[in-house]
């Protein structure tokens, strides 16, 4: 083979290999995509949850937490719409009423089935080991 043909073949094989690697990386990354929406957005467009798991966030509604053995059912709200969530697993330590929560899962027949659950805290969070006087000192620095 002539030098010119070898160079063309090398470039062509390189582009094909690069394309295959790029396609593989994009395919693998698409598995980890999870979109975020509010309960109002999810109820308005339930198709969002059909292809990929999504994250939905809001405040846990007072009086909505019901435990069933190792699973829990509760409602979250964005102050517009309430969404029923079912979760099976270990609850986060800060989980409770009037606490922000983010659930990752799928929306099936009007109920959000969560695979992961995170409890949020506000930016003023202080660990219990600090007293209120320590918090004042830390907050002023």
Swiss-Prot record:
It is found in: Cell inner membrane. It is a single-pass type II membrane protein. Keywords: Cell inner membrane, Cell membrane, Cytochrome c-type biogenesis, Heme, Iron, Membrane, Metal-binding, Signal-anchor, Transmembrane, Transmembrane helix. Heme binds at residues 121, 125. InterPro entries: CcmE, CcmE-like_sf, NA-bd_OB-fold. Residues 1-7 are cytoplasmic. Pfam families: CcmE. The keyword Iron applies. It comes from the Bacteria. One of its GO terms (cellular component) is plasma membrane. The chain crosses the membrane at residues 8-28. GO terms for biological process: cytochrome complex assembly. One of its GO terms (molecular function) is metal ion binding. Residues 29-141 are periplasmic. Heme chaperone required for the biogenesis of c-type cytochromes. Transiently binds heme delivered by CcmC and transfers the heme to apo-cytochromes in a process facilitated by CcmF and CcmH. NCBIfam families: PRK13254.1-1. Belongs to the CcmE/CycJ family. This is Cytochrome c-type biogenesis protein CcmE. It comes from Anaplasma phagocytophilum (strain HZ). The gene is ccmE.
